[in-house]
Amino acid sequence: LRGELERNDDWGVIRLFPEPSVIPQLTVQLTILASDGRELVVAAVVRAVTGETMGSSVYRDISVNDDYTNDKTDPFADLYVTMVNDIVHAVSSASHQETYLRSLSSLRYASELVPEAFPDYLGQEAGLYSVRREPSREDPMLIRLNRLQDYELLFVDTIDEQLANVSREVSDAYYL
């Protein structure tokens, strides 16, 4: 799925977070329900940092012998294309601006680390978050929290790169 999102080229950086995070403006939570090499069943939930569920589906694909050729194409690539198309549709119908979601993400991150730092800036009603007002870009606390967020992203990127390397190293075993 990640490769297909990157090929789509509409998303910016695609990261794999080891656990739920408020840093990304958009998350896709995947749960593998079945996977035996022939069948893949995946539940996908797309959420904005607002807490809004933008889409939720269960996807199923059954591979055929022709899917396992020597060209190293993932046998479930068509499933990933369908998932990305559904994500694009869900996101394109949403009303949120990217800058708003980025501000909301920053405030939610700040609220998780230091709840008393910006108590009146973030609103929450019925499980949905909103920006009530924004702190100054020169706010010293916000600057420090943004620096921490950058460090966390660097850590996630390092782990992500290591996982990608391991995946490349073992992938040949799947294409015998």
What do the PLM-derived regions correspond to, one by one?
Residues 17-32, 103-109:
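Acidic helix-start/capping segments at beta-turn-to-alpha-helix junctions
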Residues 19-25, 35-40, 71-74:
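Generic structural signal for short, solvent-exposed loop/turn connectors between secondary structure elements
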Residues 29-67:
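Amphipathic beta-strand/beta-sheet edge segments enriched in Tyr/Trp
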Residues 1-22, 53, 82, 86, ...:
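N-terminal segment of the mature soluble domain
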Residues 63-176:
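C-terminal/domain-edge helix-coil "capping" segments
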